[in-house]
């Protein structure tokens, strides 16, 4: 009886131990399986978010940083601008990441741009960069500047002096309100004379430009400091359009990121960069007229 009882007890203990080990193995396997499922789900979610973000950037809206003052004071250096990608349809040059692949010619879902639109495009003479200018001349137009006044098809546009603009650097500009034939109104700027001397006055008087079919004529709002269709830019093909600029979402007087200055200098630069934020420009509509 004793032996049988001992054997029975030993068997029970062994069975319990085996059951516990099996339970541990099952739980461990189940946990690893759940972890793998969780990791897979996290990766799927991450990839989905990235794909959605890329599609938004490619097809709907994209952020652009303006590095120069050719559109001053409508747009200043280091303004961050949102541009809508769908405004004029799509081309190889407007589809981000695909501009090096020639998928098709021309534009799909094309919409006609209007005079006065502020457009981001690839300049024909510098295709690896982006310009931002104001559209003035449409295909078939004759455009000419006489004494700084724009003539479109021999009709003088309305141009009214509207005071003085002083830049952040302290430079003075003459400010003019211009109205295009379609009724769009905006401000243009010309360097104020110093001791009676005008700057770059040769760009205020030009030959007549005849805009070819499928191409457009652009000017910068900062008339004396803009490389536009009067100078090296020339006419811009419709295919080169990237986006229509809409509004400023952020702006600073200085840039912060510079890969050449090192981490410590970036940290030291953070405070002056934050202090240079132009709060009065955040969410500014580029087509609103503010005197």
Curated annotation (Swiss-Prot):
Q: Name one GO molecular function term.
A: serine-type endopeptidase activity
Task: List the Periplasmic topological domains.
Answer: 67-291
SUPFAM superfamilies associated with the record? LexA/Signal peptidase (SSF51306)
* Compartment list: Cell inner membrane
Mode of membrane association = Single-pass type II membrane protein
Q: Which residues lie on this side of the membrane: Cytoplasmic?
A: 1-45
User: Which is one Gene Ontology cellular component term of this protein?
Assistant: plasma membrane
Q: Does the keyword Phosphoprotein apply?
A: no
According to its UniProt record, the EC number is 3.4.21.89
The protein's name: Signal peptidase I
Q: What is the protein's species of origin?
A: Rickettsia bellii (strain RML369-C)
């Amino acid at each position: 009886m004793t032996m049988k009882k001992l054997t029975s007890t030993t068997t029970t203990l062994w069975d319990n131990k085996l059951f516990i080990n099996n339970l541990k193995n099952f739980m461990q396997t189940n946990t690893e399986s759940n972890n793998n499922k969780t990791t897979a789900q996290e990766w799927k979610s991450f990839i989905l978010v990235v794909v959605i973000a890329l599609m938004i950037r490619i097809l709907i809206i994209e952020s652009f940083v303006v590095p120069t003052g050719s559109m001053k004071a409508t747009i200043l250096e280091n303004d961050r601008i949102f541009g809508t990608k769908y405004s004029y349809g799509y081309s190889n040059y407007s589809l981000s990441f695909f501009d090096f692949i020639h998928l098709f010619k021309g534009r799909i879902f094309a919409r006609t741009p209007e005079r006065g639109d502020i457009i981001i495009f690839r300049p024909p003479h510098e295709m690896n960069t982006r310009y931002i200018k104001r559209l003035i001349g449409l295909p078939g137009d004759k455009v000419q500047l006489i004494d700084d006044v724009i003539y479109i098809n021999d009709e003088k546009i309305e141009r009214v002096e509207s005071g003085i603009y002083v830049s952040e650097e302290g430079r003075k500009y003459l400010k003019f309100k211009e109205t295009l034939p379609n009724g769009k109104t905006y401000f243009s700027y010309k360097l104020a004379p110093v001791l009676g001397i005008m700057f770059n006055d040769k760009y205020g008087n030009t030959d007549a430009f005849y805009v070819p079919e499928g191409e457009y004529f652009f000017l910068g709002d900062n008339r004396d400091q803009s490389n536009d269709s009067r100078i090296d830019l020339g006419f811009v093909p419709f295919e080169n359009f990237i986006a229509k600029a809409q509004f400023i979402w952020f702006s600073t007087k200085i840039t912060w990121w510079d890969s050449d200055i090192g981490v410590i200098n970036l940290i030291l630069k953070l405070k002056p960069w934050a202090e240079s934020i132009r709060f009065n420009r955040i969410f500014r509509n580029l087509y609103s007229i503010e005197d």
